Structure formats: structure tokens, C-alpha cells
């Protein structure tokens, strides 16, 4: 089985990992309510997708006090 001949230094390892960062999400405005959403997905605030409302948006219920 192949084994590395020399140990890799911290700087060599970190230089290699410099490109492993997670990129920013590409957000687009919703054509219905102008809030930002991910492309090709239902808008989480209004439930709109392409031609009309596909899903009813979740409404937060007020907490009842005891």
C-alpha cells in the first residue's frame, strides 16, 4: 500500500484547503412579494412558484398565556 514519503507541513495542508470554503447562496427576489429566496424553489414567505401560489405560507400562532 502506498504511504507518503514525507510529512506535509501545516502550511501545505492549509494552502490546499483554501478552496474548500462554502460559497454564498445565490438569492433571487420573489416576483410576488419581493422577499429573497433560493432559485427554483417555493418562496418561504408567500408560497409562490412560477405561475401561482403552490403552498399556503405558515402562519405563526400566538402563544397562549396561562
Curated annotation (Swiss-Prot):
Keywords: Ribonucleoprotein, Ribosomal protein
Protein's recorded name: Large ribosomal subunit protein bL32
Record bears the keyword Nucleotide-binding: no
GO BP terms in the entry: translation
GO molecular function: structural constituent of ribosome
Family per similarity comment: Belongs to the bacterial ribosomal protein bL32 family.
Organism of origin: Leptospira interrogans serogroup Icterohaemorrhagiae serovar Lai (strain 56601)
Leader sequence segment: none
Record flagged with keyword Ribonucleoprotein: yes
Cellular component terms (Gene Ontology): cytosolic large ribosomal subunit
Amino acid at each position: 500500500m502506498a504511504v507518503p514519503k514525507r510529512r506535509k507541513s501545516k502550511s501545505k495542508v492549509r494552502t490546499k484547503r483554501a478552496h474548500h470554503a462554502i460559497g454564498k447562496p445565490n438569492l433571487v427576489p420573489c416576483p410576488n412579494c419581493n422577499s429573497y429566496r433560493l432559485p427554483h424553489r417555493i418562496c418561504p414567505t408567500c408560497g409562490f412558484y412560477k405561475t401561482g401560489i403552490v403552498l399556503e405560507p405558515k402562519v405563526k400562532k400566538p402563544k397562549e398565556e396561562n
